[in-house]
Swiss-Prot record:
Residues 30-59 are annotated as: NMP. Monomer. It catalyses: AMP + ATP = 2 ADP. Pathway: Purine metabolism; AMP biosynthesis via salvage pathway; AMP from ADP: step 1/1. Residues 126-163 are annotated as: LID. AMP binds at residues 31, 36, 57-59, 85-88, 92, 160, 171. This is Adenylate kinase. One of its GO terms (biological process) is AMP salvage. It comes from Listeria monocytogenes serovar 1/2a (strain ATCC BAA-679 / EGD-e). Consists of three domains, a large central CORE domain and two small peripheral domains, NMPbind and LID, which undergo movements during catalysis. The LID domain closes over the site of phosphoryl transfer upon ATP binding. Assembling and dissambling the active center during each catalytic cycle provides an effective means to prevent ATP hydrolysis. Some bacteria have evolved a zinc-coordinating structure that stabilizes the LID domain.
Length: 215
C-alpha cells in the first residue's frame, strides 16, 4: 500500500499518520526524517542538503527528489509506505511518478484531510502556554479553569508569536495556494480521496480505513 497523506496545518495529519502506519505496518516517511537520515548517514545528497540548510536556503528539488528516490528504494518501502510532506508541488509529484515507475510500482492513493479555514484558525490560534511551567492549554479543547492562569501553578498564560491570528492566517493562505494545484493534479489522475477532517479523530480514521479497504 503506497500512500501520500496531505492536509493543511491543524488538520490532524500527524495523528492519522500514526494510526495508518501502525495498523497497516508501513513506514512513515516524512521529508524531515529523510533529510535527517541522509545527513546522519553522510550520503552525497545528505551533504548537499546540509549545505543548503546551514545557509538557511531551501533545498532544491533535484536534491530533495534524489533523497526521496534513495529512501523509497530501501527494502522496508518495497511493500508500501506513507509519504508525508512530499510532494509539495506538481513538479515534485511528477518526479515521484517517475521514481515509482523506475521502481516498477505506482501510488495507490492520495488521502487529503480536508478542514475549512475557519476551523483551522480556531484550532491553531487557541493555544496558550504557561510562562512558569510550560504546560499547554487550548481555549476551546483544553481551557484552564481560570482564564489566563495555569491550573498547576497559577502562572500567566501567553501565546507564542507563531500562534497569533495574523501569523496563522498568513501561513494557511500560503499553504492553501501551494496545495491546490497538487490536489487538482491528483484529482485528475483519479488518485485523490478527500476526507472530512472536522469529525472526531476516530471517525476520520474510520473513513481512512474505508478508502484503504479497496487496496
Amino acid at each position: 500500500m503506497k500512500l501520500v497523506l496531505m492536509g493543511l496545518p491543524g488538520a490532524g495529519k500527524g495523528t492519522q499518520a500514526e494510526q495508518i502506519v501502525e495498523k497497516y505496518n508501513i513506514p512513515h516517511i516524512s521529508t524531515g526524517d529523510m533529510f535527517r537520515a541522509a545527513m546522519k548517514n553522510n550520503t552525497e545528497l545528505g551533504r548537499k542538503a546540509k549545505s543548503f540548510m546551514d545557509n538557511g536556503d531551501l533545498v532544491p528539488d533535484e536534491v530533495t527528489n534524489g533523497i526521496v528516490r534513495e529512501r523509497l528504494s530501501e527494502d522496508d518501502a518495497k511493500d508500501g509506505f506513507l509519504l508525508d510532506g512530499f510532494p509539495r508541488t506538481v513538479e515534485q509529484a511528477q518526479e515521484l511518478e517517475n521514481i515509482l515507475s523506475d521502481l516498477g510500482t505506482e501510488l495507490d492513493a492520495v488521502i487529503n484531510i480536508d478542514v475549512e479555514k475557519d476551523v483551522l484558525m480556531k484550532r491553531l490560534t487557541g493555544r496558550w502556554i504557561c510562562r512558569t511551567c510550560g504546560k499547554t492549554y487550548h481555549e476551546i479543547y483544553n481551557p484552564p479553569k481560570v482564564p489566563g492562569k495555569c491550573d498547576l501553578d497559577g502562572g500567566e498564560l501567553y501565546q507564542r508569536d507563531d500562534d497569533k491570528k495574523e501569523t496563522v492566517e498568513k501561513r494557511l493562505n500560503v499553504n492553501m495556494k501551494q496545495t491546490k494545484p497538487l490536489l487538482d493534479f491528483y484529482s485528475e489522475k483519479g488518485k485523490l480521496h478527500n476526507i472530512n477532517g472536522e469529525q472526531e479523530i476516530k471517525d476520520v480514521f474510520v473513513d481512512v480505513e474505508k478508502i484503504l479497504a479497496s487496496f
